[in-house]
From Swiss-Prot:
Protein name: Photosystem I reaction center subunit VIII
Family of the protein in this entry: Belongs to the PsaI family.
An annotated GO BP: photosynthesis
Source organism, top-level taxon: Bacteria
GO cellular component, one term: plasma membrane-derived thylakoid membrane
UniProt keyword list: Membrane, Photosynthesis, Photosystem I, Thylakoid, Transmembrane, Transmembrane helix
Disulfides per UniProt: none
Main location class: membrane
Compartment list: Cellular thylakoid membrane
Keyword rRNA processing: no
TM region positions: 9-29
Protein purpose: May help in the organization of the PsaL subunit.
Length: 38
C-alpha cells in the first residue's frame, strides 16, 4: 500500500466519519449538557 493509494482511500473513511460520527457525538454532548443543566 503506497502513499497515493492511501491518500485516495482516506476520503472514503473521512466523509462518513465527518458526516455521521461527529454530528452524532455533538448531539450527544449537547443533550448531556442540556439534561445536566436542567
Amino acid at each position: 500500500m503506497n502513499g497515493a493509494y492511501a491518500a485516495s482511500f482516506l476520503p472514503v473513511i473521512l466523509v462518513p466519519l465527518a458526516g455521521v460520527v461527529f454530528p452524532a457525538l455533538a448531539m450527544g454532548l449537547l443533550f448531556n449538557y442540556i439534561e445536566s443543566d436542567a
